Amino acid sequence: ESTGTMTKRLEAVKVPSTPENRLLFRETLFSASSMTECIGGVILYDETIKQESTKKYRIPELISKMGSTPGIKVDTGAKILAKSPDEKITEGLDGLRDRLKEYYQLGARFTKWRGVYNITKEHPSKLAIHSNAHALARYSALVQECNMVPIVEPEVLMDGNHSAQDCLAKTSEV
C-alpha cells in the first residue's frame, strides 16, 4: 500500500505512521503462513521495495521466500490532462527505464500502471483515450524491455449519474 494509505490504516488504530511501524506491519503481513495459500503476487510501492526487514533482507526477498511474486506500481499518479481540465493523464514515463532497472535488481518481476477515465456525456474524450493508451503502450514496452511483466489497468470509474448501458458503451470505447 502507498504511504498515504498505510498512514490512514495505522492512524485508525492509533499507531504513528513511521517508516519503522510501516515496515513492521508489512513484515508481519508478508511473513504470515497463510500468505502462501492464496496470494500469488504483491504490488509494492517505492518505499516498500527498498525496505530492509528486521531480519536484514529486503521485503521483495521475504515475499519471494513466501512463494509469491513481488511487483511494483510505477506510475506517479494521475494529473489534469492538458486541454481537457476535467480529465486525467497518468504520469511517470520520465526516468521510467532507469527505475525499472533498479526495481528489477531489487526483486520486482511485474509492474502496474493505471490509466483513469471518468464517465460523463462528453468523457472520456478521444484525447484522453488516445493519450492514456499511448502512455500505457510506452510503459508496457519499457517494462518488457526490462524483463518484467506489465499489468495494464485502464480503469473506467463508474461514479456519476449515468446508466449501466452508458458505462458499458464508454468502457468499450476505452
Predicted features, each with a name:
Residues 77-81, 116-123, 157-161:
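Conserved radical SAM core fold
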Residues 1, 114-115, 154:
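Glycine-rich, histidine-containing beta strand-loop boundary motifs that form or position
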